[in-house]
Amino acid sequence: MTRIGFIGLGNMGGPMAANLARAGHAVRVFDLMPESVAKAIAAGCIAAGDAREAVTGCDLAISMLPAGEHVRGLWLSEGGGQDLLGALPAGAQVIDCSTIDVASARAVGDAAKARGIRFLDAPVSGGVTGAA
């Protein structure tokens, strides 16, 4: 079973995480909004106390955040960021589904590559209906 960490459970991320849990994956989730986490738990996800706990030791980490600054702040150490790439083992995969600027995606991708982590910039389309 793939261990998945999922950060960002809004209108798009929440249904995506729920689909992964329903497919039988162990999905640890985190969001700043407790009600979003509660919905994910009801769908079979496992709550993490913070973003680092959600991704630590995972084979696959997925983020779905509002803007490039949030994605950089999550994965990188620049400007006091959380540096969550450091919580992943070499060989792990990060998929960022946020619709962000190219510079942010490249910055995270380059940092991931330097640590032996695969990065996929995968902005989503289809809206909330497609995510469900």
Task: Indicate where each model-derived feature is located.
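Short amphipathic alpha-helical segments, especially helix-boundary/capping motifs
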Residues: G10-G14, Q82-A87, V124-G126
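Rossmann-fold dinucleotide-binding core
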Residues: I4, L9, T99-A132
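Short, well-ordered alpha-helices that flank and scaffold nucleotide-derived cofactor binding pockets
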Residues: A18, R22, L76, D110
